[in-house]
């Protein structure tokens, strides 16, 4: 609007000729001049404002340009990193392709080699199966030969065993037949062809089976009640009565021991058990008089003088034979092992030590069976030339 007014005033002044201006008065010229100056000043102010606005806009655009430059630089850096990453991934892809091709070639080669080896192994298996069949046939033939030899040997052994049994029946008189599986050793005077001698020789040839049988026998000793194994087989009446009286005395002592254990401390029991050994208790169990008269059958009886001086409650019995003494010691050890004490203490035997003691008891039984061959007096107390040992 000011530009339009200024332009209109300029046109007015420019169109007015000099003659007309000269005709104007001073007042009109002064008004015209002031009016033009005001218009000029307003135009100058407006122009200045416009320049400020332009400068402000330029500053904003410059800031925007700088920000865009920074963003562009970042994007260029990211683009460069992505290019490098793409190159790296492409290299890895190429390497993976090469590696996969190499693995494929290796797999084909290994598969062909495995097929060849499988074929070779199948051929070897066929050869081994053929050899196994031939060995089976050879083993069957050898078994048949062994069975034939066993039959021939059993035939010869049965004839010799009949002769040996006849000689034993004549020697022992009215003694009962011998139980081969009673756990004791066989007689050393038996014939070489008898079944007992053949069985003993068979055990020597197979020590592993003999050891396993001995362990089974020693473990079975604890499973049998004491009254089944306390009396040996074939003893005469005097020895049997003596053993029964010993059993009654053992029961009485066990009852006394239980009463003492109820009224005493564990320390006193431990000292008492340390002080008494199995053989010492057996010697205190049945003290026998020393003055006894021998009998013809190997047993003895108590004289009236000594029997009258026996303590009260003691029943006079016959003297125990030597074989019975050893047998009772063995039975005493077995009973001590079988007895389960309610209170455990430090002196208890371990399972290994118990097995060793049982094995020693079995050896004593075998020794007693062998000792009867050299002592006729003991033979009279035995039936079948043996004791009945632990089963």
UniProtKB/Swiss-Prot annotation:
The keyword Coiled coil applies. Its main location: other. It is found in: Cell junction, Tight junction; Cell junction, Adherens junction. Keywords: Cell junction, Coiled coil, Developmental protein, Tight junction. GO terms for cellular component: adherens junction; bicellular tight junction. Residues 155-238, 278-303 are annotated as: Disordered. Residues 182-194 have a biased composition (Low complexity). Residues 19-86, 116-146 form a coiled coil. Disulfide bonds: none annotated. The keyword Zinc does not apply. Residues 157-175, 280-303 have a biased composition (Polar residues). InterPro entries: CCDC85. Belongs to the CCDC85 family. May play a role in cell-cell adhesion and epithelium development through its interaction with proteins of the beta-catenin family. May play an important role in cortical development, especially in the maintenance of radial glia. This is Coiled-coil domain-containing protein 85C. It comes from Xenopus tropicalis (Western clawed frog). The lineage of its organism: Eukaryota, Metazoa, Chordata, Craniata, Vertebrata.
């Amino acid at each position: 609007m000011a530009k339009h007014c200024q332009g209109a005033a300029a046109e007015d002044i420019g169109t007015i000729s000099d003659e007309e201006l000269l005709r104007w008065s001073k007042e009109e010229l002064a008004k015209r001049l002031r009016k033009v100056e005001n218009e000029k000043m307003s135009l100058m102010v407006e122009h200045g404002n416009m320049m400020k606005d332009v400068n402000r806009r330029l500053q904003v655009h410059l800031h925007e340009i700088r920000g865009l430059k920074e963003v562009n630089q970042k994007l260029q850096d990211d683009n460069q990193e992505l290019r490098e990453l793409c190159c790296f991934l492409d290299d890895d892809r190429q390497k993976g392709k090469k590696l996969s091709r190499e693995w494929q070639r290796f797999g084909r080669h290994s598969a062909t080699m495995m097929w060849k080896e499988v074929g070779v192994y199948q051929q070897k298996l066929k050869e081994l199966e053929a050899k196994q069949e031939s060995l089976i046939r050879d083993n069957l033939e050898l078994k048949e030969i062994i069975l034939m030899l066993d039959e021939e040997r059993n035939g010869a052994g049965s004839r010799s065993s009949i002769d040996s049994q006849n000689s034993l029946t004549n020697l022992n008189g009215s003694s009962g037949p011998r139980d081969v599986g009673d756990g004791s050793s066989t007689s050393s005077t038996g014939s070489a062809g008898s079944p007992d001698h053949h069985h003993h020789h068979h055990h020597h040839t197979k020590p592993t089976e003999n050891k396993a049988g001995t362990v089974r026998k020693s473990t079975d000793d604890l499973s049998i009640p004491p009254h089944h194994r306390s009396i040996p087989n074939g003893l005469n009446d005097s020895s049997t009565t003596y053993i029964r009286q010993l059993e009654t005395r053992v029961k009485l002592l066990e009852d006394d021991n239980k009463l003492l254990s109820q009224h005493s401390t564990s320390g006193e029991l431990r000292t008492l058990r340390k002080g008494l050994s199995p053989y010492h208790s057996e010697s205190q169990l049945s003290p026998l008089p020393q003055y006894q008269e021998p009998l013809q059958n190997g047993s003895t009886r108590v004289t009236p003088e000594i029997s009258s001086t026996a303590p009260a409650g003691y029943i006079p019995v016959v003297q125990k034979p030597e074989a019975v003494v050893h047998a009772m010691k063995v039975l005493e050890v077995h009973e001590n092992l079988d007895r389960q004490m309610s209170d455990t203490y430090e002196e208890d035997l371990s399972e290994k030590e118990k097995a060793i003691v049982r094995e020693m008891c079995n050896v004593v039984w075998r020794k007693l069976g062998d000792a009867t061959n050299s002592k006729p007096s003991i033979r009279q107390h035995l039936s079948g030339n043996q004791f009945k040992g632990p089963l």
